[in-house]
Amino acid sequence: MFSPRNIRGVVISGVAVVAALTPTAGQSAAASGCFTVSGRYTEHAVTGPECRAPVGLCIAGTYRGDISGSLRGSAATVTPTADTPATSVLTFTSDSTITGAVKGNRGTLVVKNAGVFTTLPDGSIVDLQTIVGGTGRLAGARGFVRASGTFSAVSGGTSEYEGSVCVG
């Protein structure tokens, strides 16, 4: 027969087994192929015949940190808002690729960007980078990266980024 003492021992053992087999949040993310990423990138404007952007603005640059590699992008839109005369802020959308690695997984990320930037001398920029695909070990990648920093078409810029990239 089961005594209260035996039942208590079985329950404690069962709880210990369940706790040992339950993945932590970090283990769960790794098992699903999701990675928290952070770092910085530098970028500069690209002009000439290799820039085929509808609005004439292309960029190239380098990512460092959990995402590392080369960046190429082209602006699809640059749009003033009703407040642009007072704020000097414009919105933009762009398409870009990052060829390199995410935490050692090599390939190319395909990214759709949406953000805002100021035309004032400090060049503040905020960018939401939506990862919509990839190649190589980054095939099927999805995720979001938030970036903020500075950018000028004349001098380029630097931004810090953080977000999450899921692969597979």
Model-derived features: positions:
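C-terminal region of N-terminal signal peptides and the immediate post-cleavage residues
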Residues: 8-10, 19-34
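Beta-strand-enriched cores of mature, soluble protein domains
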Residues: 29-168
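Bacterial N-terminal signal peptides that target proteins for export
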Residues: 2-12
